[in-house]
């Protein structure tokens, strides 16, 4: 999830290698392998039958915040959760792998974490649910050896950190090579390239030299729009591209049939105003060639917190969403909404009216319907409401914290399963990337133009 105080948060999961765990033969596959359906920009099984990911981000409400799922994993509780997900119609779970449970030491994966992941895969097989591992993430701890600059967002151009990630994927994907229960690997939850770091000037100098340009210092975060600033944004995009490409290559070398994506922060598409450094630099058209599909996360924050105040506010957020999905769809790969959800009101929004379950369900329905022409799968943020969370995770679940089915939980899977094959990218204004990454006013103008086109297209 996007990192907004008291609003949204993201997660990730970790895994272990055969070098660090019992090299016993893997469990036999019980689920058919899911592959990309190139013709329909979606997914299918190896028999050619359509597969629509009806997904959920899985963590438990009784494991702390950030969730310490692996350290507190209970097999029977996990099995009951998968039973509930099966009853809800869920067919894929996104889980967050952590350094603390899976990759606490360089060069090896943790046997205890791998054993727990093996158990989770066996449970998933039992209930016919695929697993979408994300990570590794620093929720439980971030080892110094993989975070040499002391800031996870500063590591995208750091060779030590990137090599540790390549090693991780080589071990993890190698251990689970051919395990069809794993739907796809997500490289990381919501990566964003930091504006400036200890490595930035050196890397920037190298990039400028390679393009035949003279030395200039790293621009200030509040610099006025200029060609130098535009170049620096392209430089940041090049770091994101290399970071994705090297990890994807490591996974494919270990398991050629594995699917790979990365969970994009919505600020990867500057369709609404973002500051120079807030732009995540994971531009879809730049990273998509190295991915099997594009995964976008979205929360309704157009012009501030979405408060269910009427059609104008709803359309403002849906138009921003559609414009972002549109940019994700342009590279021609399948698109998935890897995180979404909203509730609003009450303690999450002081001064805002508490929202209802019906409003949560209506927002979810509109999000799915608006994105369906370009999207092939959806992942709700959270199975359960999570009272201890510091963001919308408190109330975005399909179930209440004590396991009662909510309105959205009842409607979610039937709605997604009714969605047709994606029909294509709608005719709308194109995002002016050249100016939107350097000038907030350009994004504001685009947002207004797109909103008008979106409104005019509504039935």
PLM-predicted stretches and their roles:
Residues 5-15:
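Bacterial N-terminal signal peptides
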Residues 34, 165, 205, 328, ...:
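Aromatic-rich peripheral "rim/lid" segments of glycoside hydrolase catalytic domains that contact
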Residues 185, 189, 296, 338-339:
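Active-site flanking residues adjacent to catalytic metal/cofactor-binding acidic residues
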């Amino acid at each position: 999830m996007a990192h907004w105080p008291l609003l949204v948060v993201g997660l990730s999961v970790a895994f272990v290698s055969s070098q660090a765990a019992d090299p016993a033969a893997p469990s036999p596959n019980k689920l058919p392998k899911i592959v990309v359906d190139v013709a329909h920009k979606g997914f299918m099984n190896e028999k050619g039958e359509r597969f629509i990911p009806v997904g959920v981000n899985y963590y438990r409400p009784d494991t702390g915040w950030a969730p310490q799922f692996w350290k507190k994993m209970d097999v029977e509780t996990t099995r009951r959760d998968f039973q509930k997900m099966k009853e809800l119609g869920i067919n894929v779970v996104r889980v967050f792998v952590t350094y603390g449970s899976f990759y606490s030491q360089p060069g090896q994966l943790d046997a205890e974490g791998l054993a727990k992941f093996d158990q989770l895969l066996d449970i998933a097989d039992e209930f016919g649910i695929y697993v979408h591992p994300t990570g590794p993430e620093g929720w439980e701890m971030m080892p110094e050896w993989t975070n040499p600059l002391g800031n996870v967002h500063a590591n995208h151009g750091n060779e030590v950190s990137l090599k540790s990630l390549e090693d991780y994927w080589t071990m993890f994907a190698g251990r689970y090579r051919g395990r069809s229960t794993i739907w796809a690997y997500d490289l990381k939850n919501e990566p964003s390239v930091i504006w400036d770091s200890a490595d930035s000037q050196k890397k920037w100098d190298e990039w400028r030299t390679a393009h035949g340009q003279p030395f200039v210092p790293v621009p200030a975060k509040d610099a006025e729009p200029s060609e130098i600033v535009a170049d620096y944004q392209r430089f940041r995009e090049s770091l994101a591209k290399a970071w994705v490409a090297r990890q994807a290559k490591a996974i494919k070398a270990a398991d050629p049939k594995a699917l790979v994506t990365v969970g994009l922060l919505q600020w990867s598409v500057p369709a609404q105003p973002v500051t120079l450094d807030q732009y995540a630099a994971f531009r879809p058209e730049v990273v998509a060639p190295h991915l099997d599909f594009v995964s976008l996360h979205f929360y309704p924050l157009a012009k501030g917190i979405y408060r269910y105040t009427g059609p104008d506010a709803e359309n403002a957020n849906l138009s921003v969403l559609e414009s972002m999905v549109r940019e994700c769809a342009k590279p021609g790969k399948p698109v998935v909404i890897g995180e979404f959800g909203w509730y609003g009101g009450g303690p999450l929004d002081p001064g805002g009216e508490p929202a209802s379950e019906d409003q949560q369900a209506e927002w979810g329905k509109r999000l799915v319907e608006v994105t369906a022409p370009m999207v092939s799968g959806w992942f709700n943020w959270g199975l359960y409401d999570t009272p201890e969370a510091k963001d919308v995770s408190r109330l975005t679940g399909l179930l209440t914290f004590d396991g009662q089915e909510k309105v959205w939980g009842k409607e979610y899977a039937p709605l997604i399963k009714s969605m047709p094959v994606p029909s294509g990218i709608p005719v709308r204004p194109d995002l002016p990337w050249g100016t939107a990454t350097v000038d907030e006013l350009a994004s504001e103008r685009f947002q207004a133009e797109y909103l008008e086109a979106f409104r005019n297209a509504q039935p």
